[in-house]
């Protein structure tokens, strides 16, 4: 006898998802911090450490206050225990939490976020970055920012290890001095000549002063010549100047390469849960 025909299985067949390939253009330029010499590293660290110790800049944290807040949280969880609210007057010898000389702290910028904001507003004279920052992309944007604002900046090894314990912080990833600084004026003047220049291909080096040949205001004779010349002659002159400027510029364009990101096909991916299974 012939076998009975089998009924088709119920349920939908899951289709395999196609691999999503992300295409992007890579950056042909390699931007990195300029290297400091050993003598300059020791000089910068010693001058900063000595100045901070001399001024006495330090952040004081009240440990008793932290313990008290932790106890209050524990006691608030227990309703049976009564919390004694006896206000105690602080002793005169107890140090208040915060920065000791506030006016000195206002002259400095500490941390990557503060340094970034101050550079955007063009308020800094000098920027120092710790070399132990991981990943390096955290401070890589400061290279373009400092060069566009004509602010000398460099990467100093062991900056956080040497300066953070003196100030009373856990780490110092970036440090900057404001333009209105008075207490650190001599130190900034001594450090700036030791800072190497940064190299960004698409940004010109603005640390050099403007040349004498460039004139801000045209003379009366030049104005009369411009009025006498026709429109066609002016367009020719402008095109010639643009061509000369393009030849003088040292920046060269680099070819871009297409980068494709393909996900790992051997990775075991969990299938998405259906709405029916979630409702159950």
Curated annotation (Swiss-Prot):
Residues 214-226 have a biased composition (Acidic residues). It is found in: Nucleus, Nucleolus. Residues 267-280 have a biased composition (Basic residues). Gene3D superfamilies: 3.30.1330.30. One of its GO terms (molecular function) is ribonuclease P activity. Pfam families: Ribosomal_L7Ae. Residues 202-227, 254-280 are annotated as: Disordered. It comes from the Eukaryota. Component of ribonuclease P, a ribonucleoprotein complex that generates mature tRNA molecules by cleaving their 5'-ends. Also a component of the MRP ribonuclease complex, which cleaves pre-rRNA sequences. This is Ribonuclease P protein subunit p38. The gene is Rpp38.
């Amino acid at each position: 006898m012939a076998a009975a025909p089998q009924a088709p299985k119920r349920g939908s067949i899951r289709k395999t998802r196609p691999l999503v390939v992300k295409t992007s253009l890579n950056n042909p330029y390699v931007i990195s911090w300029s290297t400091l010499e050993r003598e300059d590293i020791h000089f910068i660290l010693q001058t900063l450490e000595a100045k901070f110790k001399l001024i006495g800049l330090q952040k004081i944290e009240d440990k008793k206050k932290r313990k008290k807040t932790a106890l209050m949280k524990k006691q608030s969880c227990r309703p049976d225990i009564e919390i004694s609210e006896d206000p105690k007057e602080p002793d005169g010898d107890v140090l208040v939490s915060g920065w000791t000389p506030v006016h000195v702290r206002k002259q400095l910028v500490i941390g990557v976020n503060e340094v970034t904001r101050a550079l955007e507003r063009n308020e800094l004279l000098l920027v120092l970055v710790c070399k132990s920052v991981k990943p390096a992309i955290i401070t890589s944007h400061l290279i373009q920012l400092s060069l566009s604002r004509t602010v000398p900046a460099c990467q100093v090894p062991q900056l956080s290890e040497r300066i953070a314990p003196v100030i009373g912080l856990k780490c110092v990833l970036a440090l900057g001095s404001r333009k209105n600084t008075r207490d650190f004026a001599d130190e900034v003047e001594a450090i700036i000549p030791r800072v190497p220049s940064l190299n960004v291909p698409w940004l010109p080096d603005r640390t050099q002063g403007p040349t004498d040949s460039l004139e801000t205001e045209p003379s009366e004779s030049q104005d009369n010549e411009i009025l006498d010349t026709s429109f066609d002659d002016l367009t020719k002159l402008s095109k010639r100047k643009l061509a000369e400027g393009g030849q003088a510029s040292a920046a060269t364009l680099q070819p871009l390469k297409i980068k494709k990101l393909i996900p790992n096909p051997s990775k075991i991916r969990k299938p998405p849960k259906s709405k029916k299974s979630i409702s159950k």
